[in-house]
Swiss-Prot record:
Keywords carried by this UniProt record: Cytoplasm, Hydrolase, Nuclease, Ribosome biogenesis
UniProt-annotated location(s): Cytoplasm
Pfam families noted in UniProt: RuvX
GO biological process, any: rRNA 5'-end processing
Protein family according to the UniProt entry: Belongs to the YqgF nuclease family.
Keyword hit for Transport: no
Name assigned to this protein: Putative pre-16S rRNA nuclease
Organism (species): Streptococcus pyogenes serotype M5 (strain Manfredo)
Primary role: Could be a nuclease involved in processing of the 5'-end of pre-16S rRNA.
NCBIfam families, per the entry: RNAse_H_YqgF (TIGR00250)
Length: 139
């Protein structure tokens, strides 16, 4: 069963996919979006859902450190509601506190990637971490 993980931001959506058995997550790509123009990347997402035969989604919830909802939680839930309606597939939510920080640390320490290059992959890696945390917790 393939699960797609999403890190939803205001300008990009990081995308990750699980292996068929649901053990590991792999970052796929970053989809550019524009909330002001109501462009949410659903066409590309549909292509990926078909290509990988996705059966469910996991979306990161950007909570505050004190477990209250951060300013982007509502946007993430709204995105999830759209996906559930468009694809008719279940959507789960995963606390994503510190995943972007962890992703950036990994890119600096392990890959020694420059700031400019980090910006190009950070959301994809964050989506991978969100999905991997979900897989570890549920399977």
């Amino acid at each position: 069963m393939r699960i797609m993980g999403l890190d939803v931001g205001s300008k990009t959506v990081g995308v990750a996919i699980s292996d068929p058995l649901g053990f590991t997550a792999q970052g796929l790509e970053i989809i550019k979006i524009d909330e002001e123009k109501a462009e949410f990347g659903f066409t590309r997402l549909e292509e990926l859902v078909k290509q990988y035969q996705v059966e469910q989604f996991v979306i990161g919830l950007p909570k505050n450190m004190n477990n209250t909802n951060g300013p982007r939680v509502d946007a993430s839930i709204t995105y999830g509601n759209h996906i559930e309606h468009l694809f008719g597939l279940p959507v789960h939510y995963q606390d994503e506190r510190l995943t972007t920080v962890e992703a950036e640390r990994m890119l600096i320490e392990q890959a020694d990637i420059s700031r400019g290059k980090r910006k190009k992959v950070i959301d994809k890696l964050a989506a991978q971490l969100i999905l991997q945390n979900y897989l570890n917790r549920n399977f």
